[in-house]
Each structure stands twice: as structure tokens, then as C-alpha cells.
Amino acid sequence: MARGGFPGGGFGGNMNNLMKQAQKMQKDMEKAQQDLENKTIEVSVGGGAINIVATGKKEIKEITIKPEVVDPDDVEMLQDLILSAVNEALRKADELANSEMSKITGGLGGLPGMF
């Protein structure tokens, strides 16, 4: 009987090609993950009152707050603005990572939340 129990050797020699493609995809994905560390996302909320800079790996690098939005009598508004900006930066980082990875995987589904 042929290898793998299939006539003609199973995949007809394509198994080596599949393995090579999988290894290349893995290397490409590792490189893309490293590249995401160097890509930045900038988010502004409240008409520029709060600015956030984050990496494609969801690391917040900078938060800038305009002094005029710091009101000791309305701390809750400042907290809401910061929360909104951080969440938007994280959402954009996810979009960037998904976009970069889909370039490598060719849009293959089934890998959500991998990055």
C-alpha cells in the first residue's frame, strides 16, 4: 500500500509543498507581528482635547491632555474622554493587526483574536 494508505502516496507529493507554505506563512506572520510593534496609531477625541499614540501591538506610547480639559469640578468628563481615546486606539490597533495578518493568510478565516 502507498504511504498514508492512499494510492499514489496520499497527496501526490503536495504535502511537502503544503509544509513549505505553512512554514513560510509562519515566518511571515512572525515578521508582521514584529512590524506591528513599529507601526503607530494616533487617536484624537474631544476635538483634540485628548490624543493617544499606540503601537500596532496595543501598547500605549503617549497620552496628551490639553490643560483646558482638566477641570477639578468635572473629573468624570476627563475620565470618559481618556477611556474613549484608549478604547479607540485599541480598536484601531486590532484593525491594523487583522489587516496585516489577512495579507499573509489571504483572508483565511478561523484565526480571530490571534494577535
Swiss-Prot record:
Coiled-coil ranges per UniProt: none
Record carries keyword Plastid: no
Pfam family, one: YbaB_DNA_bd
Gene Ontology cellular component list: bacterial nucleoid; cytosol
Primary subcellular site in the record, as a coarse category: cytoplasm
Any one GO MF annotation of this record: DNA binding
Keywords: Cytoplasm, DNA-binding
Record-linked InterPro entries: YbaB-like_sf, YbaB/EbfC
Alphabetized NCBIfam families for the sequence: DNA_YbaB_EbfC
Subunit architecture: Homodimer.
Family note: Belongs to the YbaB/EbfC family.
Protein name: Nucleoid-associated protein Ccel_0243
Biological source species: Ruminiclostridium cellulolyticum (strain ATCC 35319 / DSM 5812 / JCM 6584 / H10)
